[in-house]
Amino acid sequence: MMAYLVFLGPPGAGKGTYAKRIQEKTGIPHISTGDIFRDIVKKENDELGKKIKEIMEKGELVPDELVNEVVKRRLSEKDCEKGFILDGYPRTVAQAEFLDSFLESQNKQLTAAVLFDVPEDVVVQRLTSRRICPKCGRIYNMISLPPKEDELCDDCKVKLVQRDDDKEETVRHRYKVYLEKTQPVIDYYGKKGILKRVDGTIGIDNVVAEVLKIIGWSDK
């Protein structure tokens, strides 16, 4: 089974959750660019990591050429030979073009760019309901995945907190920024004829089933 996928969608769409589920079913690796960046800046002997860490510590945006280099390095690893699910990249048309040319150099091409459609109010409800344990980092959702005891972590019995970027005003701002930044990428894949839209409100199992259908995966 070979599938090269890009996952697009607003914060709170569930991209990481769907990618993990599809990885479990198909063995196609989930590549989260957020995770790659967190890992690379921890490596003391990595020149690229050092450069990125300096930029991030100044609070500046990492330029496309460095982001592209990090992604290229990860996609060149053996586990990505027969596919990947990219989550968090590309964020710009320039990055999308770089990804295309890199895949072309490997005689590969994207199978699909999957866009999870989730309305703003649903994103707001999902993210403002999110709580985190300040001690162990476990994430809860007060609607869909609540703790056993009200507002207390099941493991630590510590009072759960809401992250600043999960407050309503911030979530609405993040959604607006997402629309502005991602629309050109959505249009880019739409013109290429590989954009597939999935309703992100139909429940995890149904969403995963839709994506598996797109890539032609069968359990049989």
From Swiss-Prot:
Gene: adk
Positions annotated to bind Zn(2+): 133, 136, 153, 156
Disulfide bond sites: none
Subunit structure: Monomer.
UniProt: ATP binding residues: 12-17, 130, 139-140, 202
Keyword presence, Isomerase: no
Organism: Thermotoga neapolitana (strain ATCC 49049 / DSM 4359 / NBRC 107923 / NS-E)
Domain of life from the UniProt record: Bacteria
EC number, UniProt record: 2.7.4.3
Protein name per Swiss-Prot or TrEMBL: Adenylate kinase
Record note on domains: Consists of three domains, a large central CORE domain and two small peripheral domains, NMPbind and LID, which undergo movements during catalysis. The LID domain closes over the site of phosphoryl transfer upon ATP binding. Assembling and dissambling the active center during each catalytic cycle provides an effective means to prevent ATP hydrolysis. Some bacteria have evolved a zinc-coordinating structure that stabilizes the LID domain.
Family matches, as CDD domains: ADK
GO biological process, one term: AMP salvage
InterPro entries attached to this UniProt entry: Adenyl_kin_sub, Adenylat/UMP-CMP_kin, Adenylat_kinase_CS, Adenylate_kinase_lid-dom, P-loop_NTPase
Primary location: cytoplasm
Keywords: ATP-binding, Cytoplasm, Kinase, Metal-binding, Nucleotide biosynthesis, Nucleotide-binding, Transferase, Zinc
Pathway(s) where this gene product acts: Purine metabolism; AMP biosynthesis via salvage pathway; AMP from ADP: step 1/1
GO molecular function: adenylate kinase activity; ATP binding; zinc ion binding
